[in-house]
Regions:
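Acidic, glycine-rich A-domain
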Residues: 1-169
Length: 169
């Protein structure tokens, strides 16, 4: 709902917006985990779940054309686990392909990065550490400004420019 409201508001102000989403393709791993098991479970394997990156609205599409896609966010069974760092890199790369003079990547988050398959065999905090590294890299080397809104979750521990909304009502 918040992405929908923000996109409509920004579009009315003449700001191009893209709405992206991310999740994993499976619970408790997928082909990545199967490959790791087939390889004899090497130590420190990294991500062990397959990513699903979703484009709900492209920047050049008007909100009216994309509004039905926004309903897919709530489709039962679609959203699983969250590998935030790689999703942030994907969104950043999409934004860098745009020609606008100013580029802002706004993250709306309801929780910390979590993927049980990955976290069960890597060091504690693996996904959070990766997210922090990605945010730091973008902040140092990119022209993209990252801002975040936490919905019921304090995102200020990850993002420097962030607000937290505890009660949406």
């Amino acid at each position: 709902i918040s992405a929908d409201i923000l996109a409509r508001t920004l579009e009315r102000s003449g700001v191009k917006t893209e709405i992206l989403g991310f999740t994993t393709r499976a619970w408790k791993g997928g082909q990545s985990r199967e490959q790791w098991l087939n390889d004899g479970k090497p130590q420190n394997p990294g991500r062990l779940n397959d990513l699903k990156h979703i484009i709900y609205k492209k920047a050049d599409d008007p909100w009216r054309r994309a509004r039905r896609n926004l309903g897919l966010m709530m489709r039962e069974g679609l959203l699983k686990e969250n590998i935030d760092g790689e999703a942030l890199l994907w969104a950043h790369n999409r934004l860098m392909s745009r020609r606008e003079d100013r580029r802002i990547l706004m993250v709306i988050s309801d929780g910390a990065p979590v993927d049980d398959s990955t976290l069960s065999v890597n060091s504690a905090g693996y996904l959070e550490s990766h997210l922090r590294k990605v945010i730091d890299w973008i902040g140092r080397f990119s022209q993209v400004q990252v801002v975040a809104i936490g919905i019921g979750h304090d995102v200020t521990r990850y993002y420097r420019r962030a607000v937290t909304i505890m009660d949406v009502d």
